[in-house]
A protein has these predicted regions:
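Short beta-strand-to-loop capping motifs
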Residues: 116-122
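Short hydrophobic alpha-helical segments that form membrane-spanning helices or hydrophobic packing faces
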Residues: 119, 155, 201-205
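Long, highly charged, low-complexity intrinsically disordered interaction regions
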Residues: 125-192
Length: 205
């Protein structure tokens, strides 16, 4: 028997905005010559890869030891950086300032992501608003972002993930109807749903 989903609340909408490959994007924002190049940011002691942009993820995984991927770095022309937390912190604060300018109830969630509360804005043009937030952030600080908008934080997280993986969406994914919710959940692997840990995943698969 299939489980019936609870109806969406048209008055409640949440946005999750976050910086794409944030540490790498920070490096790109102050060094424009990096655009179009694979980038890795290494840990404090340059021991392992802690961040990669989309191009570098084709060749390197999170946590790879730097000394073990020397040949890969050379072969694919990957640009590497030591962590620069002063830069990342500064751009993070500026990015969150842009996000909060769109929403008085903005909730900073981590260094590179936060929730916007759009409750009570039913009927609003979220496509236009979302594009404006994405454009303002890119123009203001050079950081590309993705934005997911949905009735709950869990669905906003799911929408954000789909905004990253579906190039046709150009960084914005909105779940505002029952049909879109069903479509989104079909596309997203169970293990990628926010709040479902390994133990829960094992029980339901």
């Amino acid at each position: 028997m299939s489980q019936k989903l609870l109806p969406l609340n048209p008055r409640q909408m949440v946005g999750l905005a976050d910086g794409n490959s944030f540490y790498c994007s920070c490096e790109e924002s102050v060094q424009p010559w990096l655009y179009g190049k694979p980038i890795i940011v290494a840990s404090n002691n340059d021991g392992c890869a802690i961040a990669m942009n989309r191009l570098a993820k084709k060749y390197v995984k999170m946590g790879d030891a730097m000394f073990q991927i020397t040949d890969t770095i050379r072969e694919h022309g990957i640009v590497t950086f030591s962590s620069n937390y002063e830069l990342y912190g500064d751009l993070s604060n500026r990015m969150h300032s842009i996000f909060s300018s769109y929403n008085p109830n903005y909730e900073r969630y981590s260094i590179d992501e936060g929730f916007l509360d759009f409750t009570g804005m039913e009927g609003f043009d979220f496509e236009k608003l979302g594009r404006d937030i994405i454009r303002s952030t890119r123009r203001g600080i050079g950081i590309p972002i993705c934005l997911g908008i949905a009735p709950t934080k869990v669905l906003a997280k799911a929408a954000n993930k789909l905004a990253k993986t579906d190039d046709a969406r150009r960084g914005l994914y909105i779940i505002d109807t029952e049909e879109k919710r069903v479509e989104a959940l079909k596309k997203l692997p169970i293990g990628d749903v926010w709040g479902i840990g390994n133990a829960t995943y094992d029980k339901i698969t």
